[in-house]
Amino acid sequence: MRNPPPGYNTVAPYLLYEDAERAVEYLQGTFGFEERLAQPGAAGRMHHELLLGDDGLVMLGQASESFRSPRSLGIYPPVLIHFYVSNVDELHERAKAAGADVTDLETSPAGDRRFNATDLEGQVWVFAQRVS
């Protein structure tokens, strides 16, 4: 059953950061995310919604004692956040120019040209473009 509100996908990752405000600035400046929403959530912590492209929604917020970030737990993130983009080569160059920790571009057997990027708190992002 599909019942998201207008403008939302059925699934949207919600990432936790030790410094959510800094993470928003980093994701906007490094990868071109646009902030769609910023509003106070529980206990005064901000809730953010970022878009990449027309429908690439990711939500993020401030970590807390109850909801901890991978960084605060000292673990490698258990998930990768995967986005399809229209020009992966251009995004790769933009991310490198911003000083991001990125892998080299590669083409997968499935036909995705892609790279991985690790953000300032260790979340891992995969940006890809279908090329074949």
Give the ranges of each region predicted by the language model:
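Short, surface-exposed ligand-recognition loops at beta-strand->loop->(often short) alpha-helix junctions
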Residues: 15-19
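C-terminal catalytic core of tyrosine-transesterase DNA break-rejoin enzymes
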Residues: 121
